[in-house]
Design a protein with these regions (language model features):
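Phosphate- and other anionic-substrate recognition elements at nucleic-acid/protein interfaces
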Residues: 114
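Nucleotide and nucleotide-moiety/phosphate-recognizing core
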Residues: 2-111, 121, 125, 131-136, ...
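Intrinsically disordered, low-complexity regions enriched in acidic/Ser/Thr/Pro/Gln residues
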Residues: 156-159
């Protein structure tokens, strides 16, 4: 079973933040898979699981997960899910924002994440390894927007604006197409 986890913060306040691009990707992936395989999905709506403190869509082949902890505690939910379902780390994909990659770009890499990402550090700490797949979604655009001096933490909690929204939507479509191949 493949597990694709989108990292983000719960609540409407954070819904369109750069930090929530992981949630955006798994939501778009769920929508695409629902269209491609309508009979295969047991329940295509994200359902809250108290056991894992996460919203989950489950099929026989995969789980889509949105931890409902805040970003910096994402590892708690991920570790519980991996233990419960006996997930091999080679089947785990963590989708997250990445300030080391320019907006409009992404990388899917095994065992390699950004220099600093507290949500990812939480996952690594709780799993005791970094040997899983990282779907690194580029959100860096500070120089173009004239925000070069804005700290990463502040910048990542800001919403996408203007043309960034169009760029992100296009990038999410590409990522989803790659992830469909992973779970198919």
């Amino acid at each position: 079973m493949k597990v694709i986890v989108g990292l983000g913060n719960p609540g409407a306040k954070y819904q369109n933040n750069r930090h929530n691009v992981g949630f955006m990707v798994v939501e778009a992936l769920n929508h695409k898979l629902e269209i491609l395989n309508p009979k295969q999905i047991l329940n295509s709506k994200f359902e809250f699981s108290k056991r894992f403190n996460a919203e989950i869509v489950q099929t026989k082949e995969y789980l889509l997960v949105k931890p409902q902890t805040y970003m910096n505690d994402s590892g708690v939910a991920v570790a519980k899910i991996c233990r419960f379902y006996k997930i091999k780390y080679r089947d785990l994909y963590i989708v997250h924002d990445d300030l080391d990659i320019p907006i409009g770009n992404y990388k899917i890499q095994h065992g390699k994440g950004p220099q600093v990402h507290n949500g990812l550090l939480s996952v690594e700490e709780k799993l005791g390894t970094d040997q899983f797949w990282n779907v690194r979604v580029g959100v860096e655009n500070r120089e173009v927007r004239g925000n070069k001096g804005v700290p990463g933490l502040v910048y990542s909690l800001q919403d996408f604006v203007g043309e960034e929204k169009i760029i992100i939507e296009g990038m999410i479509t590409k990522i989803v197409n790659d992830l469909v191949r992973v779970v198919s």
